[in-house]
Amino acid sequence: MAAIHSSPRLTLAMDLDRVEALSADLERIAEGREAGELMRALVGLFKARVPHYHWVGIYLLEAGELRLGPFAGAPSPHTRIALGQGICGAAASAGRAIIVPDVNTDERYLACSLTTRSEIVVPMLDGAMVLGEIDVDSDQPNAFNEHDQALLERAASLIAGAVGRAAKPPRWDAPELVGH
């Protein structure tokens, strides 16, 4: 894996150099992995290598609701989310990414953790069809920017491609904690 710059961040949000390094790692990780394995690997990568990502999870769209699959961070009470409900449901309904700089000012926010201050949700798309989404929370306000969005959109694209190649889409009967 490529080394990530260890110099302190000037800003909390992702910078372009870090995005490029992590994007290269995404490509290597995705090569030859089936969809479920890829999802677990990317959740673990983001949680381990991006300090301001304090919770990372992947929701899959099944029968009109988002179901939590692999995640890293504290367990969430929101393992199933209806389309249109919360920030996750809004992103899935719209088929576009949503960045919330301060969850305390967004009435759509479904409280998962008292420490969460900002959130980004990026849908996984197959054309115009939403397959699921990547949800990331931070305990810092204004933690996400367009570089975070670009990185997560690349990950979402890789996952969507793996799901599209799968004979059977991945499915979790219960959320799966990645890492420790």
Briefly describe each language-model feature range:
Residues 61-114:
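Regulatory sensory and allosteric helical modules in signal-transduction proteins
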Residues 53, 116-118:
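Short, small/polar residue-rich loop motifs at catalytic or cofactor-binding pockets
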